């Protein structure tokens, strides 16, 4: 059974919330891609819509929206995600993950695009990050 840590970012309050997703709800995330909009009920936010913005796999490699499938590849990168150059024109070969969620993904980053009736703090508790 897959298990994910879903980070829900609230752009209105500038806070983020981390939710553990297991079982059938985690199965619903497999096969989704970066940019897909999912139902918030998966993470305990009924009435909300969440957009997948990225994530990391079990070894900490970041997902990139321009690589298709759940594959891990080594690319020559000149900018984010996956590499932040320190000098202008710097490039480096880095390992990154594709844009599709698989069982190897551990963390899924999302942002709220449509709000429900109840506030997020009431449904998920107090946010940990600012």
From Swiss-Prot:
Keywords on record: Ribonucleoprotein, Ribosomal protein
Coiled coil stretches, renumbered: none
Chain residue ranges for the region called Disordered: 78-98
Name of the featured protein: Small ribosomal subunit protein eS6
One Pfam family named in its UniProt record: Ribosomal_S6e
Superkingdom, taxonomy of origin: Archaea
One of the record's GO molecular function terms: structural constituent of ribosome
Annotated PROSITE patterns: RIBOSOMAL_S6E (PS00578)
Keyword Nucleotide-binding carried by entry: no
Record PANTHER family: 40S RIBOSOMAL PROTEIN S6 (PTHR11502)
This protein's encoding gene: rps6e
A GO biological process held by the record: translation
Family: Belongs to the eukaryotic ribosomal protein eS6 family.
GO cellular component: ribonucleoprotein complex; ribosome
Organism for this UniProt entry: Methanopyrus kandleri (strain AV19 / DSM 6324 / JCM 9639 / NBRC 100938)
